[in-house]
Amino acid sequence: ATYKVKLVTPDGPVEFDCPDDVYILDRAEEEGHDLPYSCRAGSCSSCAGKVTAGTVDQSDGNYLDDDQMAEGFVLTCVAYPQSDVTIETHKEEELTG
């Protein structure tokens, strides 16, 4: 399946289609959008965002705890869309602050 991903960035919102077997960060880069990242392995918070609508599968990541995920935080480098999804990007400071 392919879903609509909307990223709400500091420069404004962007939308693109993302298959359910492609990480959101990877697809965003293919579409020409620059997002923050570091490890690309779900082991840090550089790429953190916050899901405001829809669901993702980020079971490949190990940095976020259950409480953080319950609050909607997501690591875009290890997140597959599971529905149409809206994510606020650039949330590392909010996550770690």
From Swiss-Prot:
GO molecular function, one term: ferrous iron binding
Domain 2Fe-2S ferredoxin-type: 3-93
Record-linked Pfam families: Fer2
SUPFAM superfamilies listed in its UniProt record: 2Fe-2S ferredoxin-like
Domain of life of the organism encoding this protein: Eukaryota
GO CC annotations on file: chloroplast; chloroplast stroma
The keyword Metal-binding belongs to this UniProt entry's keyword annotation: yes
UniProt-listed InterPro entries: 2Fe-2S_ferredoxin-like_sf, 2Fe-2S_ferredoxin-type, 2Fe2S_fd_BS, Beta-grasp_dom_sf, Fd_pln
Keyword field contains Electron transport: yes
Keywords of this entry: 2Fe-2S, Chloroplast, Electron transport, Iron, Iron-sulfur, Metal-binding, Plastid, Transport
Bound cofactor: record note: Binds 1 [2Fe-2S] cluster.
Annotated localization: Plastid, Chloroplast
Residues annotated as binding [2Fe-2S] cluster: C39, C44, C47, C77
Cofactors, names only: [2Fe-2S] cluster
GO BP annotation list: electron transport chain; ferredoxin metabolic process
Entry function: Ferredoxins are iron-sulfur proteins that transfer electrons in a wide variety of metabolic reactions.
Entry-linked NCBIfam families: fdx_plant (TIGR02008)
PANTHER family: FERREDOXIN, FERREDOXIN-2, CHLOROPLASTIC
Family under the similarity heading: Belongs to the 2Fe2S plant-type ferredoxin family.
Name of the molecule in the record: Ferredoxin
Species of origin: Datura inoxia (Downy thornapple)
